Structure formats: C-alpha cells, structure tokens
A protein has these predicted regions:
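Short, charged surface segments at domain edges that flank catalytic/cofactor-binding sites
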Residues: 1-39, 61-77, 169, 185-187
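Intrinsically disordered, low-complexity coil segments
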Residues: 29, 61-69, 127-134, 147-157
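Short helix-capping and hinge/turn segments at secondary-structure transitions, especially at repeat
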Residues: 88-91, 119, 171-174, 178
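Class I S-adenosyl-L-methionine
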Residues: 91, 96-146
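C-terminal, charged low-complexity interaction regions
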Residues: 137-245
Length: 245
C-alpha cells in the first residue's frame, strides 16, 4: 500500500482544517493524492467514483450508541480517498479505527506493512513482529485486502485486479530488461492501470523505475524509501520503539 503525505493546512493555503461539507474536500484530496484509492490503489479517471473516506467513521457508534467520531465529519485530518469497495460495508465501512492500533497510509510506511505477490495475494510483511505485525494485520483486516476468490463477493474483484496487474507488470519488466520499453512507458502504464505497490514490487532492483514511481505519483511519501539502498522501504516512525513502521 502506497505510503502518502497529506498536505498540511498550516502550509497549504488552499487546504482547510475543516470544511463546510466533507464532500467539498474531494478536489483538494485528488490534487494532493491523485484520483487513486488510498487503500487498494485503483485509479479513476473520474473523481465521482471516489469517496471522501472518513478514517474514523462518522457513523461509528460505541457501546452506548454514541457517534464518537461525529465531530471529525468535516475535518481534513480525518480524510482519505477510497473506492466504493474498500469503503463498503463488507470491508472498512463503519468499523472502529483506533489510531496507533492499525497502520494507515498517511501515518505509517504501509509499503513496509504488506507484501504483494503473484495471483493477487497480499500478506503482512513476514519481517515484521510485535506491534508492527499486529498493526499491519489490523490494516489488512480493516480493508479486507487479503480477500481472495473464495471469500470475496462477486462484486469484490480487487484480488483479480491485482492478479491481472501483476501479470502485466511482469510482462513489461521483461520488455524493460530487453530494452523494448522505457521508464516513461512504465509510469504511464502504472498510472493508467493502478496498483502502485505491484509495479513497485515487480521493479525491485530497477532504481530508475522505482524513483519515477515515487516522484510521479502525487502525494507519495518519499521519506519512506531509501534512495541509497535501491529505494527499499524504511521505517517512517523510527522513534516509536513499539511500532517504528
């Protein structure tokens, strides 16, 4: 999952700390992060297909029936972009999100949290342990990103999309190795097809491609990757001893 940096309302004049209606934040989110689902990384030509997603759901009710996040309904810091599947009732929906107990793409290096493989497989990074592994697992469960063909609804084709995009990326890796395509073409394909993490995974060892993927996708958290080590992911929160990811 692509780690992202959201614009700071204190530094970007066009960004409001709070909006009159949360839907008014969508153009700003799209300029900041691209017309891309912040979770499954599907790309959209039309931003009408994207939701302004409330990280802590506005309709979540606690045991006493209180909407404990209602005050965050129009607050910029509580927004990401999501497709209807990731934000749907079968996946994130109105699940409770406790900050610090679940990795999130604007707070953690979520490319380090998860591993992408052929066949549409997404798993918790086996190199993680302790709270880091638990919080990465919570992210996977929150979005339902690990659902495969046996446990996905007929409408949830995210695993199939990933599988298809993995195969496409592999084909273009072979072409790139044989100098039958170039970096610009790879980036154009990644932007058109989506699934940033798959392209970044498949092109491991090709620094010029990885560099372009980081730089040419708006909002990508550049500090989450080590340019001196083939743009491998690094901890985003090194001072957090319990969960540096």
């Amino acid at each position: 999952m692509r780690p992202i940096v959201k614009w700071d309302p204190q530094k970007e004049e066009s960004i409001k700390e709070e909006y009159h209606k949360y839907g008014e934040a969508k153009p700003d989110l799209c300029r900041n992060l691209g017309t891309i689902c912040s979770y499954c990384e599907k790309t959209f030509q039309d931003d009408r297909d994207l939701h302004v997603e409330h990280i802590q759901p506005k309709k979540y009710k606690d045991a006493n029936g209180n909407y404990i996040y209602a005050h965050l309904e129009t607050v910029w810091s509580n927004f990401l972009l999501s497709c209807s599947t990731c934000n749907g009732p079968d996946n994130k929906g109105n699940k409770n999100v406790i900050l610090g107990k679940c990795h999130l793409p604007h707070l953690n290096n979520t490319f380090l949290s998860l591993c992408y493989k052929a066949g549409g497989v997404v798993e918790v990074n086996p190199a993680l342990n302790g709270d880091s592994a638990a919080n990465a697992h919570n992210l996977l469960q929150l979005i339902g990103l690990n659902k495969g063909p046996k446990d996905s609804s007929l409408k949830d084709k995210r695993w199939l999309i990933r599988s298809e995009k993995w195969d496409i990326a592999q084909r273009y890796l072979d072409k790139y190795r044989n100098r039958r395509t170039d970096v610009d073409t790879i980036i154009d394909l990644a932007k058109g097809y989506g699934c940033w993490s798959i392209w970044f995974s498949v092109f491991k060892g090709y620094d010029e491609v990885r560099k372009a993927l980081i730089e040419q996708f708006p909002g990508t958290a550049k500090d989450c990757f080590d340019a001196a080590n083939h743009y491998e992911p690094i901890n985003r929160n090194p001072d957090n001893l319990n969960d540096p990811v």
